Amino acid sequence: KGVVAQGQVAVKDKTRCLSIDKSKKVRNFKKMKITITSPTLNGISFKGVGDVHIENGLTTDNLDIESKGVGNVDIQSLTCQKLNVQSMGVGDVKLEGTAQIAALHSKGVGNIEAGNLRANAVEASSQGVGDITCNATESIDASVRGVGSIKYKGSPTIKSLSKKGVGTIKNI
């Protein structure tokens, strides 16, 4: 009850935002679970501590995921046209399902685990420490400029691979 009173739900630029006041300490609970239902979901911006799980599937045209937090984002049974992931935090982003186009960008420590997300076209860039695993059926544009590596499943006929860091790019 006390935790709920500290939470805020607001609408900003047609976006519903859920937050907890940083000045108030949330203590003495083992696990907090927040359930959200929505007719559409086009973006997830995760900047806190904890995990985001979508277990029962998500179908959307476009999905933007921004992860700057200390925790994981896990989406099972995703179906979308265009997926854009920006991982700049410590936690991992794990995706399963299908997408026409998947843009996966890692600048943080966490990994992007999208080996079970079949995408026709994949653009993957690793500029941090984290690794990217993806699955490309038609084309892949992969670039490594850091320590992290890019591993891709599938047999894409169109490949553009660029390595300027310590990391590797490899078909698995």
Please identify what each model-predicted range represents.
Residues 1-2, 166:
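Short, acidic/turn-prone active-site loops that include or flank metal/cofactor-
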Residues 2-41:
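Mid-chain, structured segments of secreted extracytoplasmic proteins
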Residues 26, 33-36, 41-172:
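Extended, compositionally simple hydrophobic/Ser/Thr-rich segments
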